[in-house]
Design a protein with these regions (language model features):
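Short amphipathic helix-loop junctions that connect adjacent transmembrane helices
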Residues: 1-12
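Short hydrophobic/small-residue motifs within alpha-helical transmembrane segments
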Residues: 19-23, 110-112
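Helix-to-loop junctions at the C-terminal end of transmembrane segments
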Residues: 28-40, 124-125
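Structural signature of the two symmetry-related core transmembrane helices
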Residues: 43-58, 66, 137
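Paired small-residue
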Residues: 66-74
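Intracellular juxtamembrane helix-capping segments at the cytosolic ends
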Residues: 81-94
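A late C-terminal transmembrane helix in Major Facilitator Superfamily
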Residues: 95-129, 136
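Multi-pass alpha-helical transporter architecture, strongest
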Residues: 137-161
Length: 161
């Protein structure tokens, strides 16, 4: 019975981490327009990716259950504004052709949706879940670098914030 109870506890904790991520993702999306009125797109992308990155580092780098829950909640909040802002900026990157920028972001997202689960599963099977989820830290660092490149393009007048 105790083994079964332990199994239920771990499932509950995993659900709580996903629930925290989802709740704060929704909270950020619902308040995103209000936040967008006070900050530029590049500030939101930079802040969102850094908050998401911080959440992942907390969730994966600290050994306590509560830090995992906190970390994944922060990740959801940080990432909540990134995708809507990316789509907004993408629509303005190619003058008079918003469809091209939006299609690029949408296709990139589809590749991510198709590649991430099997990649994480493969890495988890061979190296452990902590190593597999660390892939997300690397990808978030790449996204953060991308926000810096985009900020430079905005300052140079090649994109609109």
């Amino acid at each position: 019975f105790e083994a079964h109870a332990g199994d239920i506890d771990w499932r509950l904790l995993a659900a709580m981490a996903y629930g925290g991520f989802s709740f704060f993702m929704a909270l950020g999306r619902f308040s995103g327009d209000r936040i967008r009125q006070r900050a530029s797109a590049t500030q939101l992308l930079n802040g969102g990716t850094l908050l998401g990155l911080s959440g992942l580092v907390i969730a994966l780098g600290l050994p306590w259950v509560w830090t995992g829950l906190l970390g994944f909640s922060l990740t959801g909040l940080g990432f909540s504004i990134v995708v809507p802002v990316l789509f907004s900026l993408a629509a303005r990157l190619v003058p008079h052709r918003p469809d091209q920028g939006i299609a690029f972001i949408a296709n990139t997202a589809v590749v991510g949706f198709l590649m991430a689960p099997p990649s994480i599963g493969f890495l988890a099977e061979h190296f452990g879940l902590d190593i597999a989820l660390s892939l997300l830290i690397g990808l978030t660092l790449i996204a953060w670098i991308g926000t810096k490149i985009l900020a430079r393009r905005v300052k140079a007048g090649r994109a609109t914030p």
